Amino acid sequence: MGLISGKVCVFIFVFALVAEFSFGNVEVNDDKHFFHKPRPFLHKPRPFLHKHGIYKKGFGKGLGGGGGLGGGGGLGGGGGLGGGGGLGGGGGLGGGGGLGGGSGLGGGGGLGGGSGLGGGGGLGGGGGGGLGGGGGLGGGAGGGYGGGAGGGLGGGGGIGGGGGFGGGGGGGFGGGAGGGFGKGIGGGGGLGGGYVGGGHH
């Protein structure tokens, strides 16, 4: 009986020892394999999310310019309050100018001129217009309140209007024929004005 008990104890000891070295190592390896494995698919860089073209570049740049308050510019220009300019000019309140000019309240000018309230002409004329509008180099029609045909170099209009270099019909509130350098009918306009004597021939 004691011999059988001793053999059983030895068998249990050997079995436990073998199980420790075999199944114990498998459990450790499985633990490392399944639970401590690095996850490269979770830590990959995402080039489609971090492209410079998406996050680093703005959307309001380039050809055609911006806008907003005091805004943009560029080719074709912006607008807004006090806005743009550039080639083709802007507009808005007090707005742009540039090549081809703009308009607006107190607006543009530039090459090709503009209009608006108090607006001007520019090089090569364009319609004056608005309240006290004007001509520019090469003239253009004055207009607005008290206007009249602008004309010539620095032509005019406005209340009581006038001519300019190269003359043109004055105008204005009660005004007469405007004069200027090289015109026959001299004189100015003004409030209650009239025809005044000849100018330089």
UniProtKB/Swiss-Prot annotation:
Keyword Transferase included in the entry's annotation: no
Cleaved signal peptide residues: 1-24
Alphabetical UniProt keywords: Repeat, Signal
Superkingdom of the source species: Eukaryota
Inducing stimuli: Slightly induced by 16-hydroxypalmitic acid (HPA), a major component of cutin that triggers H(2)O(2) production. Accumulates in response to abscisic acid (ABA) and salicylic acid (SA) treatments.
Disulfide bonds: none
GO BP, sorted A to Z: response to abscisic acid; response to salicylic acid
Membrane-traversing stretches: none
Keyword 4Fe-4S recorded: no
Region (21 X 6 AA approximate tandem repeats of G-L-G-G-G-G, Gly-rich): 62-194
Sequence repeat positions: 62-67, 68-73, 74-79, 80-85, 86-91, 92-97, 98-103, 104-109, 110-115, 116-121, 122-129, 130-135, 136-143, 144-151, 152-157, 158-163, 164-169, 170-175, 176-182, 184-189, 190-194
Protein name as annotated: Glycine-rich protein 23
Native source organism of the sequence: Arabidopsis thaliana
